[in-house]
Amino acid sequence: MEKYHVLEMIGEGSFGRVYKGRKKYSAQVVALKFIPKLGRSEKELRNLQREIEIMRGLWHPNIVHMLDSFETDKEVVVVTDYAEGELFQILEDDGKLPEDQVQAIAAQLVSALYYLHSHRILHRDMKPQNILLAKGGGIKLCDFGFARAMSTNTMVLTSIKGTPLYMSPELVEERPYDHTADLWSVGCILYELAVGTPPFYTTSIFQLVSLILKDPVRWPSTISSCFKNFLQGLLTKDPRQRLSWPDLLHHPFIAGRVTIITEPAGSDLGTPFTSRLPPELQVLKDEQAHRLAPKGNQSRILRQACKLMAEEAKQKEDQNAGSALEQEDGLCKVTPSTAPVPGLKATPQESSLLAGILASEMKNNWEDWGAGEAPRTSRENHINLECEQGFPEPRPEAMGRQSTDVVDPENEEPDSDDEWQRLLETSEPGPVQLKSPLTLLCNPDFCQRIQSQLRGTGEQILKGVLDGVSHLLPVLRILSSLLSSCNDSVLLYSFCQEAGLPELPLSLLRYSQESSSIQQQPWYGALLRDLVAVVQAYFSCTFNLERSQTGDSLQVFQEAASLFLDLLGKLLAQSDDSEQTFRRDSLMCFAVLCEAVDGNSWAVSKAFYSSLLTTQRAVLDGLLHGLTVPQLPFHTPPGAPQVSQPLREQSEDVPGAISSALAAMCTAPVGLPSCWDAKEQVSWHLANQLTEDSSQLRPSLISGLRHHVLCLHLLKVLYACCYISERLCHILGQEPLALESLLMLVQGKVKVADWEESTEVALYLLSLLVFRLQDLPSGMEKLGSEVATLFTHSHVVSLVNAAACLLGQLGQQGVTFDLQPREWIAAAAHALSAPAEVRLTPPYSCGFYDGLLILLLQLLMQVQGKPGLIRDVVGSEVWTILWHRFSMALRLPEEVSAQEDDLLLSSPSSLEPDWTLISPQGMAALLSLAMAIFTQESQLCLSHLSQHGSVLMLTLKHLLSPSFLHHLSQAPQGPEFLPVVVLSVCKLLCFPFALDVDADLLVGVLADLRASEVVVCLLQVCCHHLSLLQAELPIGLLTRLALTDSASLKQFVNTVATSSRAIISFLSVVLLSDQPLMISDLLSLLTHTARILSPSHLSFIQELLSGSDESYRPLRSLLGHSENTVRVRAYGLLGHLLQHSMALRGALQSQSGLLNLLLLGLGDKDPAVRRSASFAVGNAAYQAGPLGPALAAAVPSMTQLLGDAQDGIRRNAASALGNLGPEGLGKELLKCQVPQRLLEMACGDPQPTVKEAALIALRSLQQESCIHQVLVSLGASEKLALLSLGNQLLPNSSNRPASVRHCRKLIQLLRPTHST
């Protein structure tokens, strides 16, 4: 503080006090912000430090510059530029500003925000109070208490910061948001500067949320079209469509006026918000937004408001019963009797509680939001006047809720309509779940009064007493609101039981339809509509779903559905059209009922839809009849009398409701497969009706395809019926009017209410027709270019994918369409990176992206032989986006790199893939696409594969995991495509081993595969999911991995040793199969195991060779196999096992014919077999024990092999004969002149290794006295001495063969002194 003079206080708030000051020894005027530490939590102090750190690094002419900051014992002091005033003050004094001044301020605000967003900083509290006036008329943005600098890993935020008047829709709904929330706030500020009031203004937080989410902005005529367009862009409710960077800079309203401050960015800053995200990051952002999206539908803002309301109500309840209760909100004072509950006069405290609840909604708690500013009281009348003059008053009921009239509950009639109307307003549901209805339901007196009023009046009506029906109508409306707005299933269902719901409204409906006296009453239509509204709201309650069943609610729901169907069937059977509105409302209620049934179990759906074909057939027949009955003309012929618009709309209501009901009955909802089978029954019935030649249903339905209201629903009906009826597809393929309507719809020549969704259904329907017919219906051959245009130019992702689906089918039928690679690559990138909105199940059980993947595969096949284009695809963003989107569809678990405030994220509990996005068929297409690319650009693709943690490698490994394969085997068409998926993955993983790759790259690939235990996955998939013929490639890959990586080999051995008998049985079947390549791979794997690992790991190999009955049938089959490669590897395996296995030696002795098979290999025509066999016999002879005598038969064959042309065979034969010497076979060896042959080899064989083997054998054999004598008689010492001398004459001792040592030792052993 010694640096500054404190002059005067210029402001005060919840944060502390602001003083005007001057820096000592200078004329610089500053603002000093004193923030007390006392009473602040650690989190608040951290946030303060964050604000200081953010401000410290900001240098911009339109942002307040922090000059200094320091701490005292009790306070934190922040020193900033001194501003001349606040923009808020100008609004207070002048009301609004001329547009040219607003334009200047807009350019400066945009400049400041551009600077912040380019540094990945969100302000999060943009409002007039945070905009200061600088010298010369400029503005400066201040107050960064809620600002957030986002890391490169954080794409969206979820914490609620800011002031409600300027909050964006995504903020008030507590959805994830990004920098576009700041841009919405700028739009609100500029609107307020120009008009005098914010675009959404009310004193009720609940109404404010509703306005922000649902109401359009009201545009006064005083603003220019350019300014209006600018504000419309900023105030777009969908943040994805909101005007943002960089387009914002180029808008004519501010173009050329914005100051851009550029400065070097840090290397770790990441992508600035002012640049468009690369598509792969856009995919990650969408995924992060999806994960961060709130699970419920309650807003944190409104939960806080309701909490405050409840606390206030409780405080009022504790006050004296007779005292008046004042609630000051800056506008009015409300007494406890402002909103009394009808008939609640038991105690003043109870009345006070409910009155407080109702009055609290009118109380303005602005100090709890944002920085704590209250509404500007002095401007209140001005704002109201401005709204009244500029716009029509939209909500008279809102004004009524702010009434200052005092009502005396003692003198008011208990059941007045005004009281019920106030309760109705309190219980009305907003766009998000409010707590007021929940608070009402928690009050037993309110519930009792509602229930008694409903039962009392309802039972009177059922008894024919019609007085007081008018009191029933507001009660019914309150019930509708409560049922629609409360999410507490237990509480709500208990209330319904006590109130007699839904039995009483259904009984009243039935009685009203049957009573002629009621039908004569003026309120008859209103009563029917309100009763249906209650029933509809009841059907939409969550306690009707099996997954959230409360008590016997599911049974009650089914009974109520049956009663309603009875009433609906009778209603549809009537020819009286006097109550068209009631008929329409009943049909819409039926559509809601279908949605509720679809969300239930298979049993509930089956029973409901089956009843429409049996006991409730009247409903279905009535709907079909209603569709064929001639209605008022939809299009007035030329010269005919014009029909008034209200009458026209009324005439369209019932046909629209009928078509909507039919669509609800047969359309399979996305992601709810439990009801598909049940709905197929209805679709079959409709399809049969449509295929009858005499039926009027098909012409009526087809003619409705060109009607702007009916089109979408009737398209869904046709699509559902064609989905299961091939006959209907053939009929429609020959129906000119139907095809013409579909083609005109795709071409945009039919004006319909929901063109995008209708076109999507039409595209899928045409795809289905081509697929079913395997031919092109008339006129479709010219459709290619128009569908291609939709594919490349539409911004609606669902349309792009539907167009891709149809293009794929057209391409298979030979239709040509001109798609340039640059266009289809860009279209694919857009379709894959934008959020997926699946509204309809694509044809033939496909996923949302299947059609796109199949089309991409077709397009890629067309450019085979053009490596440059393939390289462009792999190098483009679409390749990366493709695998990111696929991994999202697979729901790969991954760690969350950042958390938003205290929000803890977890990976999805279920790893089942999202089959609505990509089906097994789509996965097969994607992997085929990857194979085609890998084949032509192997090295480029390997770089993607070898990156540690790459999405491509993670995805491929996941496709082999047991959990995924289990889900795949249970999916529709999963068993059919499972082998295709597995084999495609294996082919892709084989590439690193089939190519000449860098050693480091291969090490990285092996480490990835080892970490995921791919060897284990391959073994399990072969054992549990593939046929023997399909297992060849996985076994080959498994073998390659185990031979290359010792850790993978151990994984294989441990899996076999610890798993069930299934794996041993599978391997045994392989060894006995007629698949020589697979047998050879397995034998190589087993041989490598026997060579590398200790004998304790080899028991399973012994088990495999002996067979289940220990007859050694597998080993016999292998040794006698017709394929040379199999015999070579079988003898090699046997040779390695005989080094350790005593059991195998015993089997050679005890098993009849087994030793003979071993010895037969010594005379095999194939040299490789002879070499392996001689190796095996040599190991069998080593320490043969009891087997030794039996090996005498091998001596002649082995002696003959000493003269083999293959040096390896000669070496093995010499070693084997040397091993037989100590086994007492001297006579047999002498008989075959083995000593002489070995001596000749030792002295004259051209190969040093063979000489060495012969010398070692002679050293072993000379231990037998008879052989020793023969060697002496042959002059072996002299011959060997000459050999030794020749080796000594070599110039370099390092080049002398190892046989020299053996030669000297043997000479020493043959000396007479040694022999004696």
From Swiss-Prot:
EC number(s) on file: 2.7.11.1
Catalytic-site annotation from UniProt: 125 (proton acceptor)
Disordered, as annotated region: 389-418
Broad class of where this protein is predominantly found: cytoplasm
Biased composition range(s): Acidic residues: 407-418
Catalysed reaction, written as an equation: L-seryl-[protein] + ATP = O-phospho-L-seryl-[protein] + ADP + H(+); L-threonyl-[protein] + ATP = O-phospho-L-threonyl-[protein] + ADP + H(+)
InterPro entries: ARM-like, ARM-type_fold, Kinase-like_dom_sf, Prot_kinase_dom, Protein_kinase_ATP_BS, Ser/Thr_kinase_AS
Classification via Pfam families: HEAT_2, Pkinase
Keyword ATP-binding part of the UniProt annotation: yes
Cofactor(s) this protein cannot do without: Mg(2+)
GO cellular component entries: cell projection; cytoplasm; cytoskeleton; cytosol; extracellular region; nucleus
Top class in the EC scheme: transferase
The keyword Cytoplasm belongs to this UniProt entry's keyword annotation: yes
Keywords: ATP-binding, Cell projection, Cilium biogenesis/degradation, Cytoplasm, Cytoskeleton, Developmental protein, Kinase, Magnesium, Metal-binding, Nucleotide-binding, Nucleus, Serine/threonine-protein kinase, Transferase
Tissue: Weakly expressed in the heart and thymus, present at moderate to high levels in the lungs, pancreas, and kidneys and at higher levels in the brain and cerebellum. Very highly expressed in the testis.
GO biological process entries: axoneme assembly; brain development; cilium assembly; epithelial cilium movement involved in extracellular fluid movement; positive regulation of smoothened signaling pathway; post-embryonic development; regulation of DNA-binding transcription factor activity; smoothened signaling pathway
Subcellular localization: Cytoplasm; Nucleus; Cytoplasm, Cytoskeleton, Cilium axoneme
Binding residues for ATP: 10-18, 33
Domain annotation Protein kinase: ranges: 4-254
Single Gene Ontology MF annotation: ATP binding
Observed effect of gene inactivation: Mice display profound growth retardation with a communicating form of hydrocephalus, nasal inflammation and early mortality.
Similarity annotation: Belongs to the protein kinase superfamily. Ser/Thr protein kinase family.
Quaternary structure (record): Interacts with SPAG16 and KIF27.
Entry function: Serine/threonine protein kinase which plays an important role in the sonic hedgehog (Shh) pathway by regulating the activity of GLI transcription factors. Controls the activity of the transcriptional regulators GLI1, GLI2 and GLI3 by opposing the effect of SUFU and promoting their nuclear localization. GLI2 requires an additional function of STK36 to become transcriptionally active, but the enzyme does not need to possess an active kinase catalytic site for this to occur. Required for postnatal development, possibly by regulating the homeostasis of cerebral spinal fluid or ciliary function.
Name of the protein in question: Serine/threonine-protein kinase 36
